[in-house]
Every structure is written in structure tokens, then in C-alpha cells.
């Protein structure tokens, strides 16, 4: 009983560390197109911010970052390094907005730099070497999956933590940009609980035919962000 409890708490601690908002990777610098939506007054209220997050979660992330995370987790379980590299290349091709693409691999490289100090795994070492040799970019969802699997976390817990972390980031940025009250942000996060579970269920065994399906409006806003006259975020 005590051994099971200790393992459960150890896993929880590892998961909380992985999604710690104070990790020095620079995630708070990126809005991934949200800033453009706010400047264009498409997202301008609590209701429209919640709609935006729901759309991102269930119409974008589950076919993009979440799906790639799920597949990378499987590749780690199988010890398939070539598959991890292939997923990195595919994800690079689907991230059409330059700022979002660069932001993702910068976060991934920094995340790997932190956790490779604590997790000794041959695939983490090989992947870091491949990044150094510019054979892969090191995208955030792939690194997130690799680190989580190396820690011994479950895929479902990893997906939930990833989606929760992404949703919190969008809500935090939206509250700041629109602006909204902090309580509005908490209300949106509370209302997302069911959708987060749904996203995990849809991502456990992703259909590879749907990889890269995205919200075109978000891709366009992410590209437009490059030429905004004033901006707070890097993407």
C-alpha cells in the first residue's frame, strides 16, 4: 500500500514539475495568434475567449500538437528513435506560421535542456544530439511526450497535463490582452474540465489521416502577427 502511494505521489510530483508555469522556457512570451484576434476584436470578451479556447482544444490541438504528442509517446514506449525524428519532420511541415513554428521548437529545446539533467534515457540523449546536429528541430509536444514517458507517466495523464497547460496559457494571455478579470479566467478554466477530458479521449489513439488539420483562421492570424504594429508577444 505504502509503495503504491509513494509511486503515485512521485508520478504526481513529476507531472506537476513538467507543467510548472515557472519553468524557464519562455512559454509566457507566445500567444500563437491570439494577440491578432484580440487586436481585430474577434476575441474581445469572456464569452469569445472561452469559445476561442474551446475551438483550439477540440478543433486544432487534438489534430496537431496533441496528436503528435500521443504518437511520440508511443514511439518512446517502442524505443523507436527513427519514428520520433519522422514525427518531428512532419510537425515542422504542418506548422505553417513561422513565429509559431519557431516558438514551439525553442520551448522544446529549453524543456529538454532542463529535464535531461534528471532523466537518464538513451532516446532523450539521442534526440538532444540530433537537435545539435540540426537533424531535428525539437518541437515542444514531442519533447513533452518523451520526457513524460521517460518519467514513467501514463499517456492519459500526459495528454491531460499538456492540454491543461496549453489552455491555461491561452486564458492567461487572453485575460491580459482583452483585458478581463482574473475571476473570468478562472471561470473559463473551470468550464473547460469536461472538454479537457474529451480532448484526451480523442487523442489517445489519433487517426494519422487527420494530422495537421487546423483552424485556418488561427494560422492566418499567427502569420499576420509577424507584421502587427504593436505587440506584447513573440507569436
From Swiss-Prot:
One of its GO terms (molecular function) is nickel cation binding. Keywords: Chaperone, Cytoplasm, Nickel insertion. It is found in: Cytoplasm. It comes from the Bacteria. GO terms for cellular component: cytoplasm. It holds the Pfam family UreF. InterPro entries: UreF (IPR002639), UreF_sf (IPR038277). Required for maturation of urease via the functional incorporation of the urease nickel metallocenter. Belongs to the UreF family. UreD, UreF and UreG form a complex that acts as a GTP-hydrolysis-dependent molecular chaperone, activating the urease apoprotein by helping to assemble the nickel containing metallocenter of UreC. The UreE protein probably delivers the nickel. This is Urease accessory protein UreF. It comes from Haemophilus influenzae (strain ATCC 51907 / DSM 11121 / KW20 / Rd).
